[in-house]
Amino acid sequence: MWLYGKREKLLWAVGGTAALTVILLSCSTFETNRSILAPPSIPGAEFVGSEACETCHESITRNFRTATHARLKAPGDNAKEMGCEGCHGPGSLHVSSGGEKSKIVNPRRSPDTCFQCHLEVRARFEMPHHHPVLEGKMSCADCHNPHEGRAIKGGGTSLPQQVKGGGTLLLGQNETCFQCHVAQAGPFVFQHEALKEGCISCHSPHGSVNARMLTERNAVLCLKCHLQEQKQGGAIFIGDSDHTTRLPQGTCWSAGCHEAVHGSQVNAHFRY
């Protein structure tokens, strides 16, 4: 995390080392201990295995082999419940009908399929401020591609998270958000450094108790990076700027001081 103040170099060094460790561990991990909690059921259908899916969905099944979801274990000893049918349900009726869409589960149309395993995400969508997935206006697949890469359609400017695009970063985390949030995309003459870490450094995309799906309330969010300290003589500095007094309640932008929080074309301090 970028930190403006005395501890910047130390924290950046520690954070960089930790990030490298995570990357190395990710690259060396070929299987996961997580199991599919509840594969979907389809009345009258049986599991046929992912090989049957490959007959029609060749490119999807080929890319899926490198995806996180492909490494999930099946409940019990039924290996056929792994792979495609772990999320789409048993496919025998879908296959025998020549690909009839009503005879297979499509998580894009039913986010409850994803929520069978992602229970904590389902809970976040119940929070006061959230993306409208439960309301049916969005689906998990609008931001995530479970068939490729590590499954998050974006990984920040340089973060190796799951993305959409053949196991590579076709869309960064920010670019995924900017598909809808166009005004925040820029480019700006003066860009907020926080964007380099990705939108999720400030926002909780599944849901939050805070307005605008912010991860923290009020000025606490800004102070995670911009250190507030009292110097000799009583002056209050935030970063390198003398703010005279400690931050009031509210946020740095709602108070009318830094309204262009994502970036500005005319002011280096994001005042407007």
Which stretches of residues belong to each language-model region?
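Short sequence/structural segments immediately N-terminal
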Residues: 2-12, 22-272
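Hydrophobic alpha-helical membrane-embedded or membrane-associated segments
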Residues: 17-20
